[in-house]
């Protein structure tokens, strides 16, 4: 890579300016301050090897061609191209989870700590009693304290104080942990309640509920078990039958009378009754007794308490309930009711006469003398007449005597109050005024006449006669139906008394008492009401406030002028004044007039005799005495009444100095804005000022494609399919593109979205910046181009077939044939002879000579051998001469990745003295182009140590330390030239970097400070850029290549710019992936040790370099300014041996 000195200095100035402008105010000692790497791009010129087929000549045994043979080899020349290099710088900011607060970084909690404080990112320290990620959750019932970490010790459902952990016992428990129940006889909260249970019941310690003993129930166990229940909680069913009652505790049955047994299921045996069947029955004539009461149940034909009597005459059967059916004097049997007939009769009921009807006598020859209509029959033997009911007499021709009726007129009538009795049935016919079966009930009030069927017409509580319905009037009434009051001036019964009331007093028609007219009093209403009273009986008191008394009859107040109302307590109504408020006011604009004299009292904002004029401009209020405020956005002076400013549309506030609140517009801010999508509403005319990215009258339309910003006036400049933000025009690049406008491809070694994916291509293959697909270089294949072309193929895509013969090998890149011994030619198809030649040690092309070269004579062999020896000797002398001016210490090229940077860089290997135990730094090179420290004019102090080192001063300046270098081995004093890597601005570990992201191993105040140190005497050191000649290294130390396939390296040397490649001895122990090597420090130091071997790490391959396994390095420049230059001593010897 080649960068000019001016470009380098400009870039340093740019970085310094950037650091000064963006210096972080954060306290770097704050443990919460972190650093991160940010990338930026610079345009650089990089070199790359360009292969070509080189034809050269060498000595051989071909006598026909005068011992000169043509050879082919693939050589590379350095070409240049421009590219972008991604560089990195360190920037300080708050660590993730923290935010800036002054100079400190304080933790940030996404969720606000509701009951606590934020002590770490998204970590809240909660107050006692609170938990959860944001301390918003109260402790559950089992935990207390900060973050609810302490477990509660409360028992039996007690509540735990979330702050102190103290137990609040549930009802029924006590103690520190609520582990004890309430004492016997107490219950409830804090065991303060006294139990009220009775009959030996126990009390529940929580609720106070009574647990009753067997046989009791009720809230307080005060009741016995209900019938049919007994035992604990009255849950057991009584087994007693037939009405037996069980004991409420034991359940033992107490049987009713007539039953016995354990469950009262056995009736008393015959002849026994009573409780427990303990009594003996006393019934006669075959009667049985009731087992419960002992009452006798008589057999048919008997009656009496103990069944000792026969049925009465005319009855028979069970309970003597049957009536005998015997007629004509027949007698019936008291048991069965059978009839025993008298003489002259026969039949089951003695109903049959032995003589024909109407005859009697022994021979039935006599005619009966009875009245036939009133007679049942005459006796067949004696001729005696049997009268029908209601008739009597010897021949049944007489009615019953008054007061009697029925069969033989034996029954006595029950009619009362002069009622008539029917002689046959005894039915009563009541006299007027009575009713009922026996006519003993007088007519109800309001009825009269026969059977009380007529309704009375008397009124006003007059008494109605039950006989004829005539009315007897009460005092004060008269008339047929007592509906007419006594005439005025009369009173009493019959209205025959005269009233004595005066002054219009009314007389009571009942008792003649006077009811005075309003305003009068006295027994005869002869006295007027006293002052202050009025109305009936002068019982009302005048209620007047501003009056000259009240009317004695009506109580109306006589109001004074200016007052009105029922009580004269109201000022004259608005618009009225004077006596009785009878005069109208002439005041205007809402003014009021004095009720006494009618003078106008103007309302606020008006003036004048009748208040007809408004306040003068600039004044308002009562009597126009107040001055208007200074209205800002108003249409004129303030309102003459209220003093409020009349705001223009879009303004509000007392002084119209406030814009309408968001979302409102217009006069008095009454309108509602319709702007959407965060659009700002104009408070005056409602027009919308749209948020960037939106347009339209209400900002509801997004910007058209390819436009952005306010009113979508800007045109998007995004390329390669990038999405353009309508808000700020920011380009969201598609995969494979980056840059402000997505015009730049991903940097070398990166691809995909945001260029975040790392390319995996090897062997200099190109990585597609979009998909990451590898485009292999000539001679390679595979997904990551990790494989060489298979044997027999070469070229791009390995599509070309090798044309090499005679077991020769084919170069997988160019197809050049490498002949087997004894063969030559482009295709190895020509026979040759083997000679010993001094091929350039860097060439990979070997010459194969045919086996028949031994046919040459001994003379030719001797001649060639001598020539070869002379040629080698000449080469050795020339090489020694060229090496005299070179440094004894040569820089080695080392590739050391750090932080997994893909576009690999080159470093100059060396040893860094670690001050204060600091870690080593790593430096990176994208392309083989270098900065070089130029010569220093004066010599430093030296000692006998063969070493050149680069050290850091305490102010982090980079110096070349030469005090330990042997002056006899290192050439001129001015050779303080060292190679700086192209991106020396990068840093390694964070503690080796400055606040602006530059590697302190390289940066200092000025390289001129080198001469100020007491141990240094050099000066005029500056940065320069130069391209150095090739140099060839033979047998370098152990390599750490990315792939074991590469075995050569190239350095520039002044002798031959087209030097072929030298074979390098690889070590299998170093075959590992260089991208996983930890960052190391690489500075300038001596390459060779005393034993002539390299003492530094080998060359590693960059992952995305087009250089196939070699690197260009700028060696230390030769200087002829010192007289000690020719003193090569052992230095030249070491250099020569190492070179060879």
Curated annotation (Swiss-Prot):
This is Multiple epidermal growth factor-like domains protein 10. Residues 1128-1140 have a biased composition (Low complexity). Residues 30-107 form the EMI domain. It is linked to Congenital myopathy 10A, severe variant: An autosomal recessive congenital myopathy characterized by onset at birth, or early in infancy, of respiratory distress caused by diaphragmatic weakness. Additional features are dysphagia resulting in poor feeding, failure to thrive, poor head control, facial weakness, cleft palate, contractures and scoliosis. Affected individuals become ventilator-dependent, and most require feeding by gastrostomy. The disorder results in severe muscle weakness and most patients never achieve walking. It comes from the Eukaryota. It is a single-pass type I membrane protein. Phosphorylated on tyrosine residues. Phosphorylation at Tyr-1030 may be important for muscle cell proliferation. Ubiquitinated; mono- and polyubiquitinated forms are detected. Expressed in muscle (at protein level). It is found in: Cell membrane; Cell projection, Phagocytic cup. Residues 106-136, 144-179, 187-222, 230-265, 278-308, 316-351, 405-440, 453-483, 491-526, 539-569, 577-612, 665-700, 713-743, 751-786, 799-829 form the EGF-like domain. The chain crosses the membrane at residues 858-878. Disulfide bonds join 34-95, 60-69, 94-105, 109-118, 113-124, 126-135, 148-160, 154-167, 169-178, 191-203, 197-210, 212-221, 234-246, 240-253, 255-264, 281-289, 283-296, 298-307, 320-332, 326-339, 341-350, 409-421, 415-428, 430-439, 456-464, 458-471, 473-482, 495-507, 501-514, 516-525, 542-550, 544-557, 559-568, 581-593, 587-600, 602-611, 669-681, 675-688, 690-699, 716-724, 718-731, 733-742, 755-767, 761-774, 776-785, 802-810, 804-817, 819-828. The keyword Glycoprotein applies. Gene3D superfamilies: Tie2 ligand-binding domain superfamily. Changing residue 326 to R: In CMYO10B; slightly decreased tyrosine phosphorylation; slightly reduced apoptotic cell engulfement by astrocytes; no effect on cell membrane location; no effect on binding to C1q; no effect on myoblasts migration and proliferation; no effect on interaction with NOTCH1. The EMI and EGF-like domains work in concert to promote self-assembly. Keywords: Cell adhesion, Cell membrane, Cell projection, Disease variant, Disulfide bond, EGF-like domain, Glycoprotein, Membrane, Myogenesis, Phagocytosis, Phosphoprotein, Repeat, Signal, Transmembrane, Transmembrane helix, Ubl conjugation. It comes from Homo sapiens (Human). Changing residue 774 to R: In CMYO10B and CMYO10A; impaired tyrosine phosphorylation; no effect on cell membrane location; impairs binding to C1q; reduced apoptotic cell engulfement by astrocytes by 50%; reduced myoblast migration and proliferation; decreased interaction with NOTCH1; no effect on NOTCH1 nuclear location. GO terms for molecular function: complement component C1q complex binding; Notch binding; scavenger receptor activity. Pfam families: EGF_2, EGF_laminin, EGF_PEAR1L, hEGF. Residues 1-25 form the signal peptide. Its main location: membrane.
């Amino acid at each position: 890579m080649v960068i000019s000195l001016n470009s380098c200095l400009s870039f340093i100035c740019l970085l310094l300016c950037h650091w000064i402008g963006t210096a972080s105010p954060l306290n770097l000692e704050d443990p919460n301050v972190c650093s991160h790497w940010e990338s930026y791009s610079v345009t650089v010129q990089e070199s790359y090897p360009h292969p070509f087929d080189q034809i050269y000549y060498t000595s051989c045994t071909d006598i026909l061609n005068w011992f000169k043979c043509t050879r082919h080899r693939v050589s590379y020349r350095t070409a240049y191209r421009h590219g972008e290099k991604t560089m990195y710088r360190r920037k300080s900011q708050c660590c993730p989870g923290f935010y800036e607060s002054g100079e400190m970084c304080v933790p940030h909690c996404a969720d606000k700590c509701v009951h606590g404080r934020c002590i770490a990112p998204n970590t809240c320290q909660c107050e006692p009693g609170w938990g959860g990620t944001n301390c918003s959750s109260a402790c559950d019932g089992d935990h207390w304290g900060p973050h609810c970490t302490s477990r509660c010790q409360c028992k039996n459902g007690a509540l735990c104080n979330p702050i102190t952990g103290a137990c609040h016992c549930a009802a029924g428990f006590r103690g520190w942990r609520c582990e004890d129940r309430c004492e016997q006889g107490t219950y409830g909260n804090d065991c303060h309640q006294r139990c009220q249970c009775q009959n030996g019941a126990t009390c529940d310690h929580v609720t106070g509920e009574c647990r009753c003993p067997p046989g009791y129930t009720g809230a307080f166990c005060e009741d016995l078990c209900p019938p049919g229940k007994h035992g604990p909680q009255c849950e057991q069913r009584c087994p007693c039958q037939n009405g037996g009652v069980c004991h409420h505790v034991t359940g033992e049955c107490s049987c009713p009378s007539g039953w016995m047994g354990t469950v009262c299921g056995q009736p008393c045996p015959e002849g026994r009754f009573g409780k427990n069947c303990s009594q003996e029955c006393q019934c006669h004539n075959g009667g049985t007794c009731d087992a419960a009461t002992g009452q006798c149940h008589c057999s048919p034909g008997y009656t009496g308490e103990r069944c000792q009597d026969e049925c009465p005459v005319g009855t028979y059967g069970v309970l003597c309930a049957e009536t005998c059916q015997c007629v004509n004097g027949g007698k019936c049997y008291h048991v069965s009711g059978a009839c025993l007939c008298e003489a002259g009769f026969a039949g089951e009921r003695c109903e049959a006469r032995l003589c024909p009807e109407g005859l009697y006598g022994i021979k039935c020859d006599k005619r009966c003398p009875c009245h036939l209509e009133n007679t049942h029959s005459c006796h067949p033997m004696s001729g005696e007449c049997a009268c029908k009911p209601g008739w009597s007499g010897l021949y049944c021709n007489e009615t019953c005597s008054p007061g009697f009726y029925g069969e033989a007129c034996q029954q006595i009538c029950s009619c009362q109050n002069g009622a008539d009795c029917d002689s046959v049935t005894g039915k009563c016919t009541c006299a007027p005024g009575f009713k009922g079966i026996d006519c003993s009930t007088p007519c109800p009030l309001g009825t009269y006449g026969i059977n009380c069927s007529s309704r009375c017409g008397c009124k006003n509580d007059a008494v109605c006669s039950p006989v004829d319905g005539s009315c007897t009037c009460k005092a004060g009434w008269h008339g047929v139906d007592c509906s007419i009051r006594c005439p005025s001036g009369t009173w009493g019964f019959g209205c025959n008394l005269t009233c004595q009331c005066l002054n219009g007093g009314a007389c009571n028609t009942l008792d003649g008492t006077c009811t005075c007219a309003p305003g009068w009093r006295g027994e005869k209403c002869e006295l007027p009401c006293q002052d202050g009273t009025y109305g009936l009986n002068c019982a009302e008191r005048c209620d007047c406030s501003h009056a000259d008394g009240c009317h004695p009859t009506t109580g109306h107040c006589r109001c004074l002028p200016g007052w009105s109302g029922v009580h004269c307590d109201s000022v004259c109504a608005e618009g009225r004044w004077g006596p009785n408020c009878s005069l109208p006011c002439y005041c205007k604009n809402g003014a009021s007039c004095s009720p006494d004299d009618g003078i106008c009292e103007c309302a606020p904002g008006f003036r004048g005799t009748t208040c007809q004029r408004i306040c003068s401009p600039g004044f308002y209020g009562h009597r126009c005495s107040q001055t208007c405020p200074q209205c800002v956005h108003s249409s004129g002076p303030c309102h003459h009444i209220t003093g409020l400013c009349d705001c223009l549309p879009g303004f509000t506030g007392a002084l119209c100095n406030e814009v309408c609140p968001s979302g409102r517009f217009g006069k008095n801010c009454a309108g509602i804005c319709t702007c959407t999508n965060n659009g700002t509403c104009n408070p005056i005319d409602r027009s919308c000022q749209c948020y960037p990215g939106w347009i339209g009258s209400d900002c509801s339309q997004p910007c058209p494609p390819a436009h952005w910003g306010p009113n979508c006036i800007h045109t998007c400049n995004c390329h390669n399919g990038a999405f353009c933000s309508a808000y700020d025009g920011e380009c969201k690049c598609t995969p494979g593109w980056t840059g402000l406008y997505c015009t730049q491809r991903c940097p070398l070694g990166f691809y995909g979205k945001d260029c975040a994916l790392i390319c995996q291509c090897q062997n200099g293959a190109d990585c597609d910046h979009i998909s990451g697909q590898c485009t292999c270089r000539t001679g390679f294949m595979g997904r990551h181009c990790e494989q060489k072309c298979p044997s027999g193929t070469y070229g791009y895509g390995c599509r070309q077939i090798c044309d090499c013969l005679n077991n020769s090998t084919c170069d997988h890149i160019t197809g050049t044939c490498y002949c087997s011994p004894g063969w030559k030619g482009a295709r190895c198809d020509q026979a040759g002879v083997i000679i010993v030649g001094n091929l350039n040690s860097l060439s990979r092309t070997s010459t194969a000579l045919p086996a028949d070269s031994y046919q040459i004579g001994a003379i030719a062999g001797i001649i060639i051998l001598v020539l070869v020896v002379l040629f080698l000797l000449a080469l050795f002398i020339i090489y020694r001469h060229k090496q005299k001016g070179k440094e004894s210490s040569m820089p080695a090229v080392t590739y050391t990745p750090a932080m997994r940077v893909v576009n690999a860089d080159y470093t100059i290997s060396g040893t860094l003295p670690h001050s204060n135990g600091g870690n080593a730094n790593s430096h990176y090179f994208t392309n083989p182009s270098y900065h070089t420290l130029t010569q220093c004019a004066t010599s430093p102090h030296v000692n006998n140590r063969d070493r050149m080192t680069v050290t850091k001063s305490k102010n982090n300046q980079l110096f070349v330390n030469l005090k330990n270098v042997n002056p006899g081995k290192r050439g001129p004093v001015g050779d303080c030239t060292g190679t700086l890597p192209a991106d020396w601005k990068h840093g390694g570990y964070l503690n080796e970097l400055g606040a602006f992201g530059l590697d302190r191993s390289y940066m200092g105040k000025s390289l001129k400070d080198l001469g100020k140190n007491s141990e240094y005497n050099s000066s005029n050191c500056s940065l320069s850029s130069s391209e150095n000649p090739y140099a060839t290294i033979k047998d370098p130390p152990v390599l750490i290549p990315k792939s074991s396939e590469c075995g050569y390296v190239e350095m520039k040397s002044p002798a031959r710019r087209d030097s072929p490649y030298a074979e390098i001895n690889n070590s299998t122990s170093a075959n590992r992936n260089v991208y996983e090597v930890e960052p190391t420090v690489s500075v300038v130091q001596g390459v060779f040790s005393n034993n002539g071997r390299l003492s530094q790490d080998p060359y590693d391959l960059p992952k995305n370099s087009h250089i196939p396994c070699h690197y260009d390095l700028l060696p230390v420049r030769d200087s002829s300014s010192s007289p000690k230059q020719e003193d090569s001593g052992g230095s030249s010897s070491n250099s020569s041996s190492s070179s060879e």
